[in-house]
């Protein structure tokens, strides 16, 4: 079940109305960080949810979905895989809408073109074909901030008209480059297909997603977000001049845009911006036991923030409920509760030393 820590974090933030009763929607990538939380919110709102996963019989990876409130009556698991053409047909048929979140995530891939990029594009088009066959109302796609601002020189502000520079990404090959390429090409292919097939398609562009979570393992985005605590230096570049959104705000923006008849096109869903120094300062104040660094090599302390404009989304009536501190404290507490983060840097080093001694 959803932990009391999570419930306390969310109390009184987003109002939940039973507007989805009688409506069936499909969520791809259901067992993941965003998918599982979105399903929780959809169930609370009265929707019947078809959740696609690669292996519905893998209890370890799906039990957190089955334990959600209202899951017994309003949630079913469906086997589907981005690598298998037509595998989403059955899950989508009979739905009024689809939330497409599933995406391959393997930053260590030895063959990113065939293991991440092509499956993301082909999987996107295959799902849209299923949607056209089913004659459903609307598709909401979870894109990425990496489709917007990855280029040689950062602008002060980015909006939905911006696209990242593919040639730059492929040449530099920074951390996560294959994910950025896959999301850019998949979204661009989706816009073309949707226009040609008169399919109502909306993309949501989240920056780094931070917050509490239901899934049992560490979400990839939190590996990045919490890198100042864990000293994962290869991820520092992503939060050097970062943008952030709370997981709950992001999921509620998905539902908001699905339900709003005026919604169309791309929408950035970013609550705030911060530099790695802003994050480090906040973490030192909230969690001094982690001894978060005060200096970061190659990064100037006075570098400016880079903003993602969510004006299009807020002008439509959406309101962000959480700030940076809310996101990070909820993420840290969830990680601690699941044993995914040490209680202090000293504890982490002790475990590390014991491990070294054991393996000598």
Curated annotation (Swiss-Prot):
Pathway: Pigment biosynthesis; anthocyanin biosynthesis. One of its GO terms (biological process) is anthocyanin-containing compound biosynthetic process. It catalyses: a (2R,3S,4S)-leucoanthocyanidin + NADP(+) = a (2R,3R)-dihydroflavonol + NADPH + H(+); (2S)-flavan-4-ol + NADP(+) = (2S)-flavanone + NADPH + H(+). InterPro entries: Epimerase_deHydtase (IPR001509), NAD(P)-bd_dom_sf (IPR036291), NAD(P)_dehydrat-like (IPR050425). NADP(+) binds at residues 61, 179. Pfam families: Epimerase. The keyword NADP applies. GO terms for molecular function: dihydrokaempferol 4-reductase activity; flavanone 4-reductase activity. It is an enzyme of class 1 (oxidoreductase). Keywords: Flavonoid biosynthesis, NADP, Oxidoreductase. It comes from the Eukaryota. CDD domains: FR_SDR_e (cd08958). Its EC number is 1.1.1.219, 1.1.1.234. Bifunctional enzyme involved in flavonoid metabolism. Belongs to the NAD(P)-dependent epimerase/dehydratase family. Dihydroflavonol-4-reductase subfamily. This is Dihydroflavonol 4-reductase. The lineage of its organism: Eukaryota, Viridiplantae, Streptophyta, Embryophyta, Tracheophyta.
